[in-house]
Amino acid sequence: METCTINARAKINLTLEIFDRRKDGYHDMRSVMHKIGLCDIVKVTVDTERTDENAGEIRVICSKYVCAEKDNLAYKAADSFMALYYKKTGKIASCIIEIEKNIPDKAGLGGGSADCAAVLDALTKLLGVITEKEKEEIAAYLGSDVPFMLEKYDCALATGTGTTLQKLPMMPMCYCVTGTPDKGLSTRDIYDLFDEKKHVVPNVKANSLISALEQEDFGRICDNIVNQFEPICIHEVSEIGKIKKCLLKSGAYAAQMSGSGSAVFGIFADKEQAEAAYRALGTLPFDVRRSVCKI
């Protein structure tokens, strides 16, 4: 048996702009995404020597915040990889995936996608055979955030359904505090509400933010952080707005919901101020899953 352990990092959406639903049922979007230090720890163990009735078994062992095994993106990643591995080699491999969850689920932080990408990376390192192009095709098939999580760079402009990526400069060194209320949000439900309500939304400034990233202008980056989904999600889960208000009151240069929610992130230039904001979230009159990390 061989083992590979990978840190699967969360992401935040610095901008998120949604367009009309396409004929295939998906929405076109445009988003500047950035990875952060918050991560799950994914350990993958493979066994190519088993010959008993459990040969080819895929098991997912997860600490918390996880759906049924076969609905789990990490499971689907292993299943897709192993099918291609068998097709190319004629060999059967068993796989155990152990996930130490730190990224909340249904939060807009890409936890499931990060785990999925980590499994694909680990299996490629352990078993080889699969090309980078084949791995990227599996990633795009499994989820719109997975291709970004698979990339080695930290920041990108995602367009189309989210799978077309353009590498961007990283943010200047700073700190991120996240707060996630217990009530999660279904991405599908939020897209349906977006279609139904056609919410009046902020003017998204992705081009201005990209220019600010290129110039390493921290203040202007923060001025152009915005999310079209946020008004809809605050209407559905009022705690999102309260977390955002707490982060801004604690000195965040910017605070915004990530993805389709329900996590909110705050950007801080100073570590001590970020840690103070983390503590402030703990005083809110409802449960908040919190993290503080570098960007």
What label would you give each PLM region?
Residues 14, 42-44, 74, 112, ...:
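Residue-level signal for inorganic ion chemistry
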